[in-house]
Amino acid sequence: MKKLTVNVNPKYDILIEKGLLSMAGELVKTVLTGKKLALISDTNVYPLYGESVKASLEAQGYAVYEYVFRAGEVSKKPQTVLDMVEFMADKGMTRGDGVVALGGGVCGDMAGFAASIFLRGIDFVQIPTTLLSQVDSSVGGKTGVDLPQGKNLCGAFHQPRLVIIDPNVLDTLTDHFFADGMGEVIKYGCIKSSSLFARLENENPKDFIEDLIFESVDTKRIVVENDEKEHGERALLNFGHTCGHAIEKLWNFETVSHGEAVGIGMVMIAKAGENIGITEQGTADRIKTLLEKYSMKTEDIHPVAEIISAMNADKKRTDKGIKFAMISKIGESFIKSVPMEDIPKMFGEIE
């Protein structure tokens, strides 16, 4: 078993091994000591794994109450989280009880947010079931929902007590959803690891999936430990996300997936960096070629002016502009604050 410890307060472990899902109850029991659990999942994941996880939890003596919501970003809104909180209240859950999130990024974000606000905060465990959630969203404590004005504008930092990653669950992912997660993996290569990026260029990621997950999560772990609440270095993890979130908003969080949008955003911001001379020439093309290897989109049909306009609601905006995560070359990243009036010029050569 591969194990990482995230040294925040409270610290927690990330466990990675094929077959861990069958041990869910035993593992959860090590960190959640209450009597009741809300098992939160969606309509895609619960039919696949929900009953077996529920049985595993019940075998440890928990009373388990499953809450299953409609799968997809369309459900990631305040009302869904309020429904979860009311569900937990109806079941008589107390501060000693907990939440188990079984699903992808949307599930983890909402279940974690519900846990953060129910009774002013109860413990929760992440069991991510998509590549995207295993390598990114399940780690770091960011929880929340979308608003009509933009993505992830309502939320809280609430660290899980444990993250259980079973790579076997990725076998049920379609190629599309596997590629969706690759967008975040490629991001880690772009901002921190030229060797990971090169390996993704030259090998099949499914041949080294546990190593891939471990390296991605370890990269995020280090950044989160250094900057838990995103006051500095953690903003590097937003590489491609400012443009990406704007694109998701323009598609009403439906047509273009998060990983696809981030991929497009990485190409856009790398090209913008090349335009103003702070990113090595050819970097955007290299990212584009790697995304295309996984059949991912590399451009959006919306005019750049519309994408820039949609950035106005980005949570990283200040009164002086937007803080962009950028790269000087593959594997080296930095933060650049760009005044709003200079952003169109920076993206000016992107068609």
For the regions a language model picked out, list residue spans one by one.
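C-terminal charged capping/lid subdomain of soluble metabolic enzymes
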Residues: G183-I186, I278-E351
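ATP/NTP phosphate-donor binding region
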Residues: M1-D97
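Buried hydrophobic packing segments
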Residues: M84, A111-A115, V185, I247, ...
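Non-catalytic interfacial helical region
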Residues: V85-L102, A111-Q126
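Short glycine/serine/threonine-rich phosphate/pyrophosphate-binding segments
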Residues: V106-F113, Q134-V135, H245-A246
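Active-site segments that bind and position negatively charged phosphate/pyrophosphate groups
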Residues: A198-A305
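Residue-level signal for inorganic ion chemistry
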Residues: E17, L39, P128, D166, ...
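A glycine/threonine-rich phosphate-anchoring loop and its flanking beta-alpha core
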Residues: L15, F113-E203
